[in-house]
Swiss-Prot record:
Zn(2+) binds at residues 10, 13, 32, 35. ATP-dependent specificity component of the Clp protease. It directs the protease to specific substrates. Can perform chaperone functions in the absence of ClpP. This is ATP-dependent Clp protease ATP-binding subunit ClpX. Component of the ClpX-ClpP complex. Forms a hexameric ring that, in the presence of ATP, binds to fourteen ClpP subunits assembled into a disk-like structure with a central cavity, resembling the structure of eukaryotic proteasomes. Belongs to the ClpX chaperone family.
Amino acid sequence: MSRYDSHLKCSFCGKSQEQVRKLIAGPGVYICDECVDLCNEILDEELFDGNANPAPPPGSPKPATAATTSHQGPRKPKRSLTLSQIPKPHDIKRYLDHHVIGQNEAKKMLSVAVYNHYKRLAYQQSAEEAGETIEIQKSNILLIGPTGCGKTLLAQTLAKLLDVPFAVADATTLTEAGYVGEDVENILLRLLQVADLDIEEAQRGIIYIDEIDKIARKSENPSITRDVSGEGVQQALLKMLEGTIANVPPQGGRKHPYQDCIQIDTRNILFICGGAFVGLEKLVDRRLGKKSIGFVHPEESKTKEQRAAAILRHMEPEDLVQFGLIPEFIGRMPVTAVLDPLDETALTEILTEPRDALVKQYQKLMHMDSVELEFRQDAIEAIAREAFRRKTGARALRGIVEEIMLEVMYELPSRQDVTHCTITREMVEKRSSADVLLLPSSLPTPESA
């Protein structure tokens, strides 16, 4: 096509070549750069339109709407929830007991709260059909406990039992809208991705927000400076916790005015927030007028952490306000559970008793190399003792076992003469070599000896 042919026009808008920046020729047709830009805008709009389901560009998430599925094949039918399908509080706690050691009071509170939450969902479905107008508000949960005591594990286990989508978010990465960091809506995007971009399924899931104490207000006077990662985040979370139609950017990141967003109703999403709240026990102790921490106490056999947990059981909402949470945020967390710190006995049980206990995991790994792994009881107690000294709860257990098992897991897969390996207390305390049992054919004969 000659660029000097002035009679050439765009086949779509009718503009001549002189009126546009570029005219592209096809077989018998022409299109200008303005129409190309318009077509791109239309395609971008339809990418997340419920009436269209085109293939997304490489590297981007698949479109998700209430009317389409994000995976190949027919859409899963919407699951109806009846009261008989919801596990009772006793059943929930029994299931938690198989996976989480201790924390009986917290398990009871969680079992009742989760049972009531999903009973509320079942009621909503039946109420819509019966035309009832009573609306039952949801009860989000606040977990308070030291690091490594099982806050996240409790939430994960609940989601596994209920077979609902579960997402974990870190509150420390969140900032107020307009500032560097993540918007609070990105929490919902994680839940949506776990649900395979099925909005209906995501809207009945569970979100666990960890390190919630890190968004406490930095100053008692909110007017001194703008607290974009503290009070600002709390304000941004309020509507989401209570229940709202949130606009979620489908590819994450910041929202902008010309972006199509996915709408998610958070009214039926259960939010569980957890944090260590270091120093909160001092505020409670001061309010009670007692000096239990650091002085001779009637329960002097307890550790400092155990005494702190006992004081936290007398916590009131005003203590959380003084810690830095705003009253509106606390009001949307009506269920508060305090978790106990793990002592040596609990750490010993964690190593062996749960279904997926750490000792069982390493025994399974070594069994795949045809080696039977045995942990002596005194070795298990020594591991628990060392983990207790590290003051990081159950998280320390895996690190210690990894240190102990490093040489074993490095050497034994290459040896065909070992059938049994024993971990002893000396190996834990001195990092000495493990006791191994050789095959009879590999044992030295008296003559060779």
